[in-house]
Amino acid sequence: MGSNAVKLGTGAATGMFFHAPSGTALPTYPTDTLGSDWKEVGYVAEDGITWHHGRSATPLKDWSNSIRRMLQDDATGTVAVPIISTTKEVLETLFGSGNVTESAATSSHGKLEAVEVKEGVISGEEAFLFLMKDGDDTIMLGTTKGFITTLDDISFAPGSAITWGATVSADAWKLILDDGQVTT
């Protein structure tokens, strides 16, 4: 096994984190040109994304305490994503497009983005896609139906980027790795 088996999860320079309406088909290959429904959300912080593919199960045991069957309790996967862009697209992704309004610049203020934060409300379902690149290798992680289920605390401090830490949750994820070695 060579060193090429060790992959880096570096975000693709031309886009890293995308969203589209729920049910939008994922690309077949990580290098495919994305359809017009896919919109780039924003820059991901240097720590990258964290995929948690968790499942839990309850063992069913017989009288001798031997496991006879496993009942699956939960199988939701999550991606934690720290977003360092502060744009209308980011705000709409995190808080829902119906909760973000934009006002044009006037003689008394610049262009305004206003967010109505409704606690306890989860934004609607969407398709999500993360693209990574390491040399010729490309990696794609996506879901056709996911939700932003948690938002981390947001720090507004001098000397550091405003980071919108979000968790995308979905029942089904697709991971594709392409070594980039095409045949002729």
Question: Model segments located where?
Answer:
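Polar/acidic, low-complexity leader/linker segments enriched in S/T/G and N/D
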Residues: 1-42
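Surface-exposed ligand/attachment interfaces on beta-rich extracellular proteins
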Residues: 29-36, 62-65, 69, 104-115, ...
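Short amphipathic beta-strand/extended segments with alternating polar/hydrophobic composition
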Residues: 30-31, 42-43, 50-54, 139-147
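Short, solvent-exposed beta-alpha or beta-beta edge segments that form flexible loop/patches at the rim
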Residues: 52-80
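Beta-strand-rich interaction surfaces with strong enrichment in secreted/lumenal proteins
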Residues: 66-69, 129-130, 154-156
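Oligomerization/assembly interface segments of phage tail-like spikes and tubes
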Residues: 69-91, 159-175
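Short helix-loop boundary/capping segments
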Residues: 89-90, 94-137
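Mixed-charge, glycine-accented linear interaction segment located at domain edges/termini
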Residues: 135-184
